[in-house]
Amino acid sequence: MNDRELDLTEEQKALKAKYPPITKKYEYLDHTADVQIHSWGNSLEEAFEQCAMGMFGYMTDTETVEPIDTVEVESEGDDMESLLYHFLDDWLFKFSADIFFIPREVKVLHIDRMRYKIRSIGWGEEFSINKHPQGTEVKAITYSAMQIHETEQPEIFVIIDI
């Protein structure tokens, strides 16, 4: 399943038509009781960005989100896997426990591979059930079967708890 089909209202369809389509370099892979996100990019930064957008794409149609507000997220870890975990968890916090922020786009500004720190920014708005279609709630990020492949075209595999 490459994309989730959500029933959109005419208003949501009109909103999607206002902006160019979002490039999606992620897919959802079946996993028992959970969902695995497989993301990729031309760089590790892009693979991280796409992984975050894959997580948000499971919760709503991100093309119905308008880039009204900006949120910055800084995360750190002890290795690349924990950095990815905290990066996704910090973005999930912005949605579920902080300001209900849903991004249309996430951009990684810098990954410090020596100190395992990442700076990122997202453009979006506050989630509104009246404006955005409701997908499936993401409860948590997991370390289970987490993989980061730093090849010519980096790939990431992450299981999210739904």
From Swiss-Prot:
Single GO biological process annotation from the record: tRNA splicing, via endonucleolytic cleavage and ligation
GO cellular component terms listed in the entry, alphabetical order: tRNA-splicing ligase complex
A molecular function (GO) term: metal ion binding
Superkingdom field: Eukaryota
Protein's UniProt keywords contain Glycoprotein: no
Binding site for Ca(2+): 34, 161-162
Keywords assigned by UniProt, alphabetized: Calcium, Metal-binding, tRNA processing
Family to which the UniProt record says this protein belongs: Belongs to the archease family.
Quaternary structure annotation from Swiss-Prot or TrEMBL: Component of the tRNA-splicing ligase complex.
Physiological role: Component of the tRNA-splicing ligase complex required to facilitate the enzymatic turnover of catalytic subunit RTCB. Together with ddx1, acts by facilitating the guanylylation of RTCB, a key intermediate step in tRNA ligation.
Stated name of the protein: Protein archease
Lineage, highest ranks first: Eukaryota, Metazoa, Chordata, Craniata, Vertebrata
